[in-house]
């Protein structure tokens, strides 16, 4: 069972968005990780990136860096 909690949102000038979520796994709710969902200006999902061993600050920095054009999206 997974539950998601929106932690923060970061926007590009063109309306694209990076949403940072906390994903809680397991029945006890004690295990979790952070994830970013990237969407284009029309709301179409571009990619999801999971960060299972990173702190919230690290993940939020990654989302902000994408919005600033510092981080590029690469799958794989």
Predicted segment positions?
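Short N-terminal "domain-start" leader segments
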Residues: 1-35
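A short, exposed loop/beta-hairpin motif centered on an aromatic-Gly-Thr core
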Residues: 6-9, 41-61
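Intrinsically disordered and other compositionally biased segments
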Residues: 16, 29, 41, 74-75
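Short amphipathic C-terminal alpha-helix that caps PH/PH-like domains
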Residues: 63-67
């Amino acid at each position: 069972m997974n539950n998601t909690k929106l932690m923060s949102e970061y926007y590009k000038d063109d309306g694209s968005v990076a949403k940072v979520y906390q994903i809680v796994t397991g029945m006890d709710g004690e295990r979790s990780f952070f994830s970013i969902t990237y969407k284009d200006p029309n709301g179409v999902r571009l990619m999801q990136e999971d960060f299972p061993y990173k702190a919230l600050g690290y993940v939020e920095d990654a989302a902000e860096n994408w919005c600033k054009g510092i981080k590029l999206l690469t799958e794989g």
